[in-house]
Regions:
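An amphipathic, basic-hydrophobic helix/alpha-beta surface used to engage anionic
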Residues: 1-148, 187-191, 197, 203, ...
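Conserved phosphate-coordination/catalytic loops
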Residues: 111, 165-172, 195, 259-262
């Protein structure tokens, strides 16, 4: 029997920890009612949408007293300014994401991205937000438009569970293609190791920002890529170009590698700051729920 995808990457312990979190859109959104985010439409231009039962903590002025007189029950008038956000998860499935180091609990970067994306999808749907999915390598491989229904969550999780790493990546090109899929204001959440052309990456990310998209960049990396711990003569194989391999003394390369890696990270951090993008560097040795809890707490203080 095929394992339930809901619990392959989204475990009950993750659900328990994620359920207490709340991801609020920073930018005003526009869309269907019923969510928790601030709308772009305010004041007299706001249209009445529907009633919902009054709960403790609601503003008294929002109570529909005429309806109370007819039903003897308290109801709140909901307007178009109580909106849900459209979020798009963009998950890298290129060959480099298939790396797993000695400290990653046997998880590849792709495994980690799938589980983190699953947690994000569950969190968004539980907030009555709409979540969509794009998986990619050199091009978009799967595209699921944003929806908020519980059965839609299953489709997203099944697609994530079926994704396989392969080949090279063109993150900048893929994000440029994404522009045509994100016509309405929302949040784009990118999960990738971001190994590639940084200038092309931010050229596309800046266009997404100009297209009214809030962008979250989860850069998923392995501890080995951060500190290059290799000591003995090692055969390094490319995970994207399978014919490329190199037998070297890693100690002689370590200083040069760490310098170039630091420059790469500084470029990503600087590009995110310049474009007002949330950069969340994540190591595969970190717990998923802790990563989300820490980020959301920091986001709430910004």
């Amino acid at each position: 029997m095929t394992a339930n995808p809901l619990f392959r990457w989204l475990r009950p312990t993750d659900i328990e920890k994620v359920s207490v979190l709340q991801l609020i859109a920073r930018d005003a959104v526009e869309g269907a009612t019923g969510g928790i985010h601030r709308s772009r439409h305010v004041g007299a231009s706001v249209d009445f949408k529907e009633h919902r039962p009054y709960v403790h903590g609601d503003e008294i002025r929002s109570i529909d007293w005429k309806l109370f007189g007819k039903t003897d029950r308290l109801y709140i008038r909901q307007y178009e300014d109580e909106t849900s956000v459209r979020a798009m998860l963009v998950v890298d499935q290129s060959g480099s994401m298939n790396y797993s180091g000695t400290r990653s609990r046997e998880l590849t970067k792709h495994d980690y991205a799938i589980r983190l994306a699953s947690c994000l999808a569950y969190l968004l749907v539980s907030q009555q937000d709409s979540v969509g999915l794009v998986t990619f390598d050199t091009a978009i491989r799967k595209h699921i438009p944003p929806r908020s229904r519980p059965n839609h969550l299953r489709l997203v999780l099944e697609t994530l569970a079926g994704a396989e790493c392969r080949g090279e990546t063109e993150l900048g090109t893929v994000l440029h293609q994404l522009l045509s899929l994100c016509r309405k204001r929302g949040i784009v959440m990118v999960l990738s190791d971001c190994f590639g052309n940084v200038s092309e990456l931010f050229k596309s990310l800046s266009m997404l920002r100009a297209n009214n998209q809030e962008v979250l960049l989860f850069q998923i990396i392995d501890d080995d890529e951060v500190d290059f711990p290799f000591q003995n003569r090692t055969l390094f194989r490319s995970l994207e170009l399978t014919e490329q391999q190199l037998l070297v003394d890693p100690v002689s390369l370590r200083e040069s590698y760490l310098r170039k890696f630091a420059m790469h990270q500084e470029s990503i951090q600087g590009g995110c700051k310049q474009n007002r993008i949330d950069w969340i560097p994540v190591r595969t040795s970190e717990a998923f729920s802790s990563v989300l809890a820490t980020y959301i707490a920091r986001r709430g203080q910004a």
